[in-house]
Amino acid sequence: EDLFRRLGLSVDWSLLYTTIEDRSRRASQRGFLRNLARGEAYTQEAPTLWDVDFRTAVAQAELEDRDRPGAYHTIAFHKSDGSGDVLIDTTRPELLPACVALIAHPDDPRYQPLFGKTVRTPLFNVEVPVFAHPLAQIDKGTGIAMCCTFGDLTDVIWWRELQLSMRAIISRDGRIVSEAPSGLTDPAGLNHYASLVGKSAKQAQTSIAEMLTAS
C-alpha cells in the first residue's frame, strides 16, 4: 500500500482485500461449490512435476535446466509379426517398462508401413502400438521414439492426444514400484522387472542398460 501511494496510483482503498483473508476464502469456496453443482468440477488422473526428496509438487517456475553427462542407448523393439526389429535411440532406458507406444513423424517414409501395427518391448515383451504424430523429429536419433509415462512434456502430449495407456513405474520417492505395470505378463519380463523394484531411477537405468547389453 505504501508503494502504491508513493507512486500516486488512483486506488479505492475501501476495496482492499488480501488473497488469504476470510472474505477471499469464502468467495473462492463458493465459486468452487457452484462449479461442483454445475458439474464443471471433476477429478482426473494426470502427471505433475514432483520433487522426490521433499515429496511435494513443484511449480514450473521453480525448474532449472542443467546440463549433465548422458548417453544414447539404441534399443531394438521386435515387430509383432516377426519380420524384424525397430531401432530407437533414448537417453532414458530406465523407462522401458513404462513404454506405451512408439511414435514417428507422419511424413517419415521409413516408418509409414508401421503405423497402426504393433511391436514388442525388449526384456519385457509387452505389445505396444506404433503411431504417427507431428511432434516426432525425423532428424533426431533414428527418427522414431518410445513414448513412456512419463519422461518429458512431449510424452504427456502424446499420452493425452493419442489416448495411450498409463504405466507409471516410479513412486513418489523416486524408486521403481513393486507392482508390475499393466500388460507385463511374460514370465521372463516379470523377472527382469522384479530385479528393478526398489531401485532409484539412476540405478534402474544402469541395470536395464546392462540387461539389454546381455540380451
Q: Model-predicted segments: where are they?
A:
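Acidic, Ser/Thr-rich peripheral helices and adjacent loops at domain boundaries
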Residues: 182-202
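Phosphate/diphosphate-binding loops
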Residues: 199-215
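Short, charged, amphipathic alpha-helices and their helix-cap/turn boundaries
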Residues: 1-3
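NTP-handling and nucleic-acid-processing catalytic cores
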Residues: 6, 10-11, 15-17, 21-179, ...
